[in-house]
Regions:
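Conserved nucleotide-ligand handling architecture
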Residues: 1-144
C-alpha cells in the first residue's frame, strides 16, 4: 500500500511517494505536494474557493490573519492528502466539502470529515505540513 503525488512545470518536476506493508491496525497516510507558486491561484477571491471550501470555512480562515493565499494553498493540499488517505482506507471518493477545516496549530491542520454512504463515517484528521524551497508537502493520517 502506498501513495504518490507530483507537481511539475516546464522546467522541473517533483514527486513524493511512500510504500509500506498493510496490516489492519496500522495508520493510513495520504500525501500531496504543491508548488508554492500555486498560491497565486488563491490571491483572487472567486468561485474557485467554493469548490473546496464551504462559506463557514472561508470565514474561519479569514479570521486567522495569516498570509491567506498561502494558507488556502496549504488547506487545499491538506484536503487532497485526506482524499487520498480516505480512498486507501475506505475505497470511496470523498468530496472536498465533506472535509471541514477546524484549526491550525503550528505545523498541523485539523479537519472534521463526514461521509455518508452504506455506513456513516465521521473522523477527525490531523495533517502535518512543511515546505521545501519551492514546494508545500502535506501528510494526512487516518487512524484505524
Amino acid at each position: 500500500m502506498g501513495g504518490i503525488s507530483h507537481v511539475g512545470s516546464k522546467k522541473s518536476c517533483y514527486a513524493i511517494a511512500y510504500a509500506r506493508n498493510n496490516t489492519p491496525k496500522e495508520k493510513i497516510f495520504g500525501i500531496d505536494i504543491e508548488s508554492q507558486k500555486h498560491y497565486i491561484f488563491f490571491q483572487k477571491k472567486d468561485e474557485f474557493y467554493d469548490v473546496f471550501l464551504n462559506k463557514n470555512e472561508q470565514e474561519e480562515i479569514e479570521k486567522l490573519l495569516k498570509d491567506q493565499a498561502y494558507l488556502y494553498l496549504i488547506i487545499f493540499s491538506a484536503k487532497e492528502s485526506i482524499i487520498k488517505a480516505f480512498y486507501l482506507k475506505y475505497k470511496q471518493i470523498i468530496d472536498f466539502k465533506n472535509i471541514k477545516f477546524k484549526a491550525l496549530d503550528g505545523a498541523f491542520l485539523y479537519f472534521y470529515l463526514r461521509q455518508e454512504s452504506l455506513i456513516e463515517i465521521t473522523l477527525e484528521v490531523k495533517v502535518y505540513f512543511f515546505h521545501t524551497n519551492n514546494e508545500i508537502i502535506t501528510i494526512s493520517c487516518i487512524e484505524n
